[in-house]
């Protein structure tokens, strides 16, 4: 796997209300069931937060990468190869759940990561409302995986934004050791 510079940038982000409202619009006005997020959406506090940009490259087709990230059984095998599993963070007591459609729930790494699928374009894009255990109720970030054909492989143009301040370095390392490195092993 080759990875371009891991970029952590400061940028102005929408308020929680704008993010959640946008997600509701994306589902034709249907509520997502993000109870904490809706409750937290009452705050109209604009803020500046960090974001993460990574571009890992894999020796696999876009279809294969997309399936590995959206199929619970395949993703559970990735979890087994991850640093989280080795550290005991993801004991595997609760198997991965990955909703296959927009609005579907996700629960990964033994329930440590939870959220909703916001957009799924097969073999092209995955956008998730994503949160880690220990975050304040209602704190959801946006994780976007754009799958780009690169030669005989696939580059994931990955952007993670709207997460709590001070979490960028920890999250950037987490994506590397819990997603990209085990995904590379799984796909090889």
Spans of features found by a protein language model:
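N-terminal secretory signal peptides
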Residues: 1-14, 26-27
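N-terminal export leaders
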Residues: 14-35
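C-terminal segment of N-terminal export signals and the immediately downstream linker at the start
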Residues: 34-68, 97-99
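Intrinsic-disorder/low-complexity, polar/charged segments enriched in Ser/Thr/Lys/Arg/Asp/Glu/Gln
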Residues: 49-55, 62, 112, 125, ...
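Hydrophobic pocket/interface hotspot
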Residues: 65, 75, 106, 117, ...
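Short beta-edge strand/loop motif at the mouth of beta-sheet-based domains
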Residues: 73-112, 123
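Hydrophobic-ligand binding "helix-grip"
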Residues: 107-151, 161
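A short acidic/glycine-rich loop-to-helix N-cap element
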Residues: 158-178
């Amino acid at each position: 796997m080759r990875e371009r510079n891991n970029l952590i940038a400061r940028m102005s982000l929408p308020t929680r209300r704008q993010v959640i409202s946008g997600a509701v619009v994306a589902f034709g006005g249907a509520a997502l069931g993000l109870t904490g997020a809706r409750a937290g959406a009452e705050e109209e506090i604009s803020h500046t937060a960090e974001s993460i940009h990574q571009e890992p490259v894999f020796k696999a087709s876009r279809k294969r990468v997309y399936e590995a990230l959206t199929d619970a059984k395949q993703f559970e095998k990735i979890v087994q190869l991850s640093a989280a599993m080795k550290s005991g963070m993801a004991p595997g007591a609760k198997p991965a759940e990955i909703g296959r459609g927009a609005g579907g729930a996700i629960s990964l790494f033994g329930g440590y990561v939870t959220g909703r699928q916001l957009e799924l374009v097969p073999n092209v894009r995955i956008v998730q409302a994503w949160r880690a255990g220990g975050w304040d109720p209602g704190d959801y970030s946006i994780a976007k995986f754009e799958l780009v054909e690169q030669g005989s492989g696939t580059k994931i143009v990955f952007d993670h934004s709207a997460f709590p301040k001070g979490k960028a370095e920890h999250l950037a390392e987490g994506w590397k050791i819990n997603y990209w490195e085990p995904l590379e092993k799984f796909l090889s």
